[in-house]
């Protein structure tokens, strides 16, 4: 039986992985730091060891006999402002570095890492000449004028988005994104130095039951849900035509189980996505229709640092892991409209 250390086991995605593992031939050692910013003060989770991945001595103890680490522990979300940077660096990057050092000391050579699509930055686009273009970040002047689409840096013409593949340029645009790319870089260097194996799963927009309620660190689907529960119209930024890939948490858990069971060499990054593009406006409308709530409000406002379109190719994950999402966004979001959410007792900013 494969013995797995699961970090972040009390979190949204970690909890679903823990549930999925019960139906597989895996022995799970579940740990979580139970940060107040995520779980509230004094929170505990049944069957989960209270452990911070920055504590190397405790990690080495629980790593004895572990075959694979499934590393979900992280401070998540785009953040509120630059003051969040130390928390991301401490929990995500330093925490991952400590974990990798502890794995080396304990003789554990396989890692499944929760990464994110945010490492791609603006994504990939096609210009009118059929050339692939990596656009510059959108300017405040264009956004203020309601010009939301990415434009060719030379001609100024609007660009068409392309599916993002794993070998696309990595250009993080937020503190959180920078921390996720740093995690990948540490893990890749560790794999080279130790001969270990890393599968970095680049999650796209994850949603599903027990997602945290409306906080600045929640996903947009949960924020739309929270507005509808209060009888308010979901507020959609820009023109609502931003394309994304929404992937159900049950599929994300399945991708992790498949990665734990796979035996790959070196460092491999894989998109975890539904393979079905959908716009943010469509997400809001599906949820509003399913709940019989108010029509979403397209605000025309924007958030600095948001990317316009980011939609993934699912081909490599299917080829490498045999993983293919089973829940398409329209069906999954309709069910999510009435799914239970987790009360976010910890609504403050993450702390170092």
Q: Where do the language-model regions lie?
A:
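N-terminal Rossmann-like NAD(P)+-binding domain of SDR-like oxidoreductases, especially those catalyzing
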Residues: 1-203
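Hydrophobic alpha-helical packing elements
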Residues: 13, 58, 62, 179, ...
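A short beta-to-alpha transition loop/helix N-cap that caps and shapes the active-site region
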Residues: 37-38, 120-123, 210, 280, ...
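A conserved pocket-lining segment of Rossmann-fold NAD(P)-dependent short-chain dehydrogenase/reductase
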Residues: 81, 155-174, 198, 202-213, ...
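Structural element of the ATP-grasp superfamily
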Residues: 99, 187, 224, 317-318
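Hydrophobic alpha-helix immediately C-terminal to the catalytic Tyr-X-X-X-Lys motif of short-chain
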Residues: 182, 186, 190, 220, ...
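C-terminal substrate-binding subdomain of Rossmann-fold SDR/epimerase-dehydratase oxidoreductases
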Residues: 228-352
